[in-house]
């Protein structure tokens, strides 16, 4: 047993950085997300570390003495949380900061630093970003989780097997070391990241005038750090939902689904389970439909009469293929079939999914008339993306349908704050503009001293001229340049943007290989800047194992694959190869050399490593650059808006949604977004508004 510390023991005099970590009881975290806004949990204790001290202050543990909860929050709020001169460090700051704000009623002041965000900008390709994983890799230290588990099992006589969900049931003396280790690791990580990694020069760029530009992670980390308070406010504010309208819509969708099934039943006497292929098979048989594919044949192990598995001459189980009788029914097959009942199944499925996944899904997360979704700022164990774009969860508002009647009805459920209209601000063709920006930056066609093919120079001049028109359509401009349809131009453009190969592109265009080859040659001859940009970025990524975006967000290519690949005529592509870390790739290459040469000779050929191996996924270089730069632009716009007192509510793809109280506010939002990061061509933001999200125009 040990005495609990007193708040007066915490000495913050002369301290500029403090690490903070909370232990909580958050029972609905896995099903409904962070519980701080709903207040359906509580903080059990607060761990604090400075360069000289570490404490764990218990406030809500069972079977132990605790500090007075109200007094503790009041004291720490005054001395620490509201002190603008002390930097606060967290790991997964969104979680702890939201609980602190929930408990105190105030947003923390001063710089809020997150070692999970730092770890992500330092290496966005990691698989895990937990405190334990990061600490193990960077500090060679781990959390005391397993030690705590053993102690709790012994203390509880095996009754408590997972202390992580039962912290409130444990006495202070069991939790103290674990909590203090967590907060100490957080502080150590921050000190290491700040000293060694955030200002580490990863690339030196030489400008045309000969000056040097040093690229580090610091700039993008500062952008993400400035954005963080905005996201906390977005989380707490949430977005209003018309609950009664949602309930009515759910009933209408259910009725529509059931009516469709009744029609099928009336005319065929078949009860269809719309999501079960085996059930739909009965309808196919009734309608004498046989033009469908079947699922793959099932493998079955052969057995003798006693039930023993039979073996072949290699000692492996004998296998026979059992012919499948289950129909393979993709949506396109059902949707385009001449049989009206199959088309009805598609409509019934749409109604069923909209009701169960979206309407009821939204209602499950409504708290006092609003939804407070979890916003995943950057790559983490909770979500986020490798490109820096947001993801959302609990619920995922980015998956709300947008097309068709159902999409419109779903979006009508989202309503603005009282006295406001719903405003939607959408970057117009954000990704193509970024492509044009980089093409004009890397290939300054106006400089006569720079050699380049005439068709490249002419295409760049034409594309830059086209952007002097406010309503320019990139895909139409390229279509006119290449003398092809807009549909074809858009498909090729997006295919190149997303790293799509020729075979996949031909399939998307519904062309034969020969037809596609002619089309691509025409496209690349008339609009060569897209292909050249893509190829040059691939080469840069292979040479440097990284790219950097408009906001200096690094895109790393630190996995490796062999160059020695064989073509498979059956699948009409190269055989897949393993993706390896650099160390594993070098070990694999060494093993290949040892098979070919004697041990002492093999080392002499290790210098040929890059002749046989290359960074993997570099074909995605252009896409990574586009997506990362778009994320930078959107996040910079959100920071700029927040600093003007304007709070976004939903961010989806290239769109920001918020409640608009005046035309002046709408004008500020539009101009701020367009000027967040300036390009070689003008940005354009389309503004639409209405009484709800579904009625904007």
Residue ranges: model-predicted function:
Residues 2-8:
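A short, well-structured beta->alpha microelement
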Residues 1-2, 18-29, 36-148, 152-697:
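Conserved catalytic core of nucleotide polymerization and phosphodiester-bond processing enzymes
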Residues 12-13:
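Glycine-rich phosphate/diphosphate-binding loops that line cofactor/substrate pockets in enzymes
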């Amino acid at each position: 047993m040990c005495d609990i510390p007193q708040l007066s023991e915490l000495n913050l005099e002369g301290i500029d950085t403090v690490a903070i970590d909370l232990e909580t009881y958050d029972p609905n975290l896995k099903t409904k997300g962070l519980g701080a806004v709903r207040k359906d949990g509580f903080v059990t204790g607060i761990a604090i570390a400075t360069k000289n001290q570490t404490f764990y202050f218990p406030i809500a543990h069972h079977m132990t003495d605790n500090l007075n909860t109200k007094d503790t929050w009041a004291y720490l709020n005054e001395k620490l949380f509201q002190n603008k001169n002390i930097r606060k460090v967290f790991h997964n700051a969104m979680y702890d900061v939201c609980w602190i704000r929930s408990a105190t009623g105030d947003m923390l002041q001063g710089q809020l630093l997150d070692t999970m965000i730092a770890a992500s900008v330092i290496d966005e390709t990691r698989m895990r970003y937990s405190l334990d994983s990061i600490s193990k890799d960077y500090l060679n230290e781990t959390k005391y989780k397993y030690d705590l588990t053993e102690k709790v099992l012994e203390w509880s006589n095996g009754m408590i097997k997972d202390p992580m969900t039962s912290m409130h049931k444990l006495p202070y003396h069991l939790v103290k070391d674990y909590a203090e280790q967590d907060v100490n690791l957080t502080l150590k990580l921050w000190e290491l990241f700040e000293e060694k990694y955030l200002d580490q020069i990863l690339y030196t760029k030489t400008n045309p005038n000969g000056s040097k530009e040093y690229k580090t992670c610091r700039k993008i980390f500062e952008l993400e750090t400035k954005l963080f308070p905005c996201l906390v406010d977005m989380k707490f504010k949430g977005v209003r939902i018309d609950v009664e309208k949602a309930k009515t819509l759910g009933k209408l969708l259910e009725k529509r689904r059931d009516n469709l099934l009744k029609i099928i039943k009336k005319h065929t006497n078949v009860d269809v389970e719309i999501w079960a292929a085996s059930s739909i098979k009965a309808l196919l048989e009734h309608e004498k439909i046989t033009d469908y594919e079947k699922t793959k044949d099932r493998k079955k192990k052969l057995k003798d009469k006693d039930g023993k598995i039979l073996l072949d001459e290699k000692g492996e189980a004998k296998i026979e293929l059992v012919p499948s009788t289950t129909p393979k029914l993709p949506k396109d097959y059902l949707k385009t079939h001449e049989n009206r009942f199959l088309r009805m199944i598609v409509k019934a499925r749409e109604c069923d999914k909209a009701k169960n996944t979206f309407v009821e899904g939204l209602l499950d997360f409504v708290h006092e008339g609003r939804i407070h979704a979890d916003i995943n700022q950057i790559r983490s164990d909770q979500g986020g993306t490798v490109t820096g774009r947001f993801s959302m969860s609990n619920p995922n508002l980015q998956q709300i349908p947008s097309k068709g009647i159902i999409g419109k009805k779903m979006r009508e459920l989202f309503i603005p704050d009282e006295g406001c209209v719903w405003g939607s601000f959408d970057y117009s063709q954000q990704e193509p503009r970024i492509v044009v920006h980089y093409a004009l930056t890397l290939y300054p066609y106006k400089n006569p001293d720079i050699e380049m093919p005439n068709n490249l120079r002419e295409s760049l001049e034409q594309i830059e001229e086209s952007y002097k028109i406010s309503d320019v359509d990139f895909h139409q401009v390229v279509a006119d340049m290449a003398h092809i349809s807009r549909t074809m131009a858009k498909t090729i453009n997006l295919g190149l943007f997303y790293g799509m190969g020729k075979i996949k592109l031909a399939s998307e265009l519904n062309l034969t290989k020969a037809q596609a080859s002619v089309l691509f040659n025409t496209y690349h001859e008339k609009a060569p800047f897209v292909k050249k940009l893509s190829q040059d970025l691939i080469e840069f990524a292979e040479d440097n194992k990284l790219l950097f975006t408009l906001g200096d967000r690094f895109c790393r290519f630190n996995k490796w694959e062999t160059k020695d690949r064989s073509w498979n005529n059956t699948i009409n592509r190269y055989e897949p190869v393993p993706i390896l870390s650099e160390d594993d790739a070098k070990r694999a290459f060494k093993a290949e050399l040892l098979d070919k040469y004697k041990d002492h000779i093999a080392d002499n050929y290790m210098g040929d490593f890059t002749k046989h191996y290359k960074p993997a996924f570099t074909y995605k270089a252009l896409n990574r650059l586009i997506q990362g730069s778009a994320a930078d632009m959107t996040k910079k716009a959100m920071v700029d808006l927040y600093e003007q007192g304007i709070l976004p509510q939903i961010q989806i793809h290239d769109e920001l949604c918020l409640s608009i109280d005046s035309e002046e506010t709408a004008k500020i939002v539009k101009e701020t977004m367009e000027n967040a990061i300036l390009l070689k061509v003008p940005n354009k933001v389309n503004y639409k508004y209405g009484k709800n999200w579904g009625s904007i125009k």
